[in-house]
Amino acid sequence: MTVNSKRIPFGKPMLEAFCMDPEYTNLNSSSCGSWPKVVSKQIRDYWSLLEAQPDLFSEFYQGLVLQEARLGLARLVHAAVSECVLVSNVTTGIFTVLYNQEFEERDVVVTLSTTYGAIDHGITSLAETRSFKTRRVEFELPTTGEKIVSQFETTIAQIRAKGLRPRLAILETIVSIPAVRMPFEDLLRVCQKECIMTLVDGAHSVGQFEVNLQELHPDFFVSDCHKWLFVPRPCAFLYVAERNQHMMRSAIPTSFGFIPKNGNSQLPLWSQMVSANGTASSFETLFAYTATSDNMPHLCIPTALRFRRDVCGGEAAIYEYIKWLAKEGGDKVAEILQTEVLEEPGLGAGADGQMRDCGIVTVRLPLAIATGPSTAPAHVPGGALTEKEVGPAVRYLTKALADRYKTWIPIADCRGWIWARLCAQVYLEVSDFEMAGNALKVICEEILSREMGQEISDSYRWHD
């Protein structure tokens, strides 16, 4: 499908190219994402083709487009196409890698205190039936990248001092919430020096900032495409360095590409799904046909990439704008609330820290938690919230944002305060962040004055 090559300015003009309700302000790209109308039309066209000739579409046509999608992603992240396969989401990709590891009893999987909850649970679940141990690198935000790296190195030394082997480290590019960019490049270098395998959770990466896997050199890398790349959900890809592909014996679920220890993989004779030229590796074959799946989001990757190139002006322009907007918008929200953004402590005025080198910003709300650490002041206008009040307050806040302001903002607690995560995007402007800041200010004042009402909206209520 051809994308209209006319460049559209970022901000409000770009919003018309997307599927969003014009009355809705999407400040949460890093959860559900969003995609342009041309991609929406593309997925509907593919559905029509599938339903018109289901077998012919599935067995002949979609394989060609999926190969094009993998090629586009490989170019985007500077990797070989033979190292990139398509999966439904990051959690699936990460668990697939973990499932295929042959752990020994002295092996340790190293995580961070900021590791995404679903990943943490997946590791705990697997450890119940596999012979490996887990160790978490503990630190509290806000902190500096140097301190995180130092604590990581200390933890590795402690593991080895006990006669154990740090086998695999799970790193993240951006913490989900409270959102900050991690020093993953430095952590990767430490792991490479220490001969520790690396599995990078890049859920919030591709489409938000440049990812160069040739330079990073991870063992495994997974990223969602539906968060920042303008692709329908769910959509992700898994990168496995060629040197490690022998470890990957099964996709999830196990299907025709599985290679028995004393045999070969055999796709059905009728399947044309692997590649147009039939030169796919065993690793590619493993993920080419994993039972009946919804491949529609993956089929839209080429259209999304063309839109980003032709209509948005290219990846570099997108990265520059959303990083600038997150900085300006986040500062504006903090100014309205008279609080602060989450970043490295002690940064001078106008200094740029690594933790904000992305399109997401986390801003402290004027809502302290009474049982928080000493970093929370003794006096807050209206008084601090008790632990019992926090849950109802957050529910009230998010519901009021939805009902009154037609937006939604993720909320988290950190070091005795409640924080809000806001995402920049090409169809947003600083004025959208100003709206969010003013909305948060009004609602927080209601919470602190204990004037919370019963926020109910029939438009958001599920019906049987």
UniProtKB/Swiss-Prot annotation:
Keywords: Alkaloid metabolism, Lyase, Pyridoxal phosphate. Belongs to the class-V pyridoxal-phosphate-dependent aminotransferase family. GO terms for biological process: alkaloid metabolic process. It comes from Epichloe uncinata (Endophyte fungus). It holds the Pfam family Aminotran_5. Gene3D superfamilies: Type I PLP-dependent aspartate aminotransferase-like (Major domain). Its EC number is 4.4.1.-. Loline alkaloids show broad-spectrum anti-insect activity, and different lolines may have different biological activities. In vitro tests of NFL, NAL, NML, and semisynthetic loline derivatives with long carbon-chain acylations on the 1-amine have shown that many are effective against both fall armyworm larvae and European corn borer larvae, but the effects seem to differ depending on the modifications. N-Formylloline reduces the weight gain of fall armyworms by deterring feeding, and does not significantly affect corn borers. It is an enzyme of class 4 (lyase). L-cysteine desulfhydrase-like protein; part of the gene cluster that mediates the biosynthesis of loline alkaloids, potent insecticidal agents composed of a pyrrolizidine ring system and an uncommon ether bridge linking carbons 2 and 7. Lolines are structurally differentiated by the various modifications of the L-amino group and include norloline, loline, N-methylloline, N-acetylloline, N-acetylnorloline, and N-formylloline. Pathway: Alkaloid biosynthesis. Its cofactor is pyridoxal 5'-phosphate. The modification N6-(pyridoxal phosphate)lysine is found at K227. Induction: Expression is induced in loline alkaloid-producing cultures as well as in planta. It comes from the Eukaryota. This is L-cysteine desulfhydrase-like protein lolT2. The gene is lolT2. Disulfide bonds: none annotated. InterPro entries: Aminotrans_V_dom (IPR000192), PyrdxlP-dep_Trfase (IPR015424), PyrdxlP-dep_Trfase_major (IPR015421). GO terms for molecular function: lyase activity.
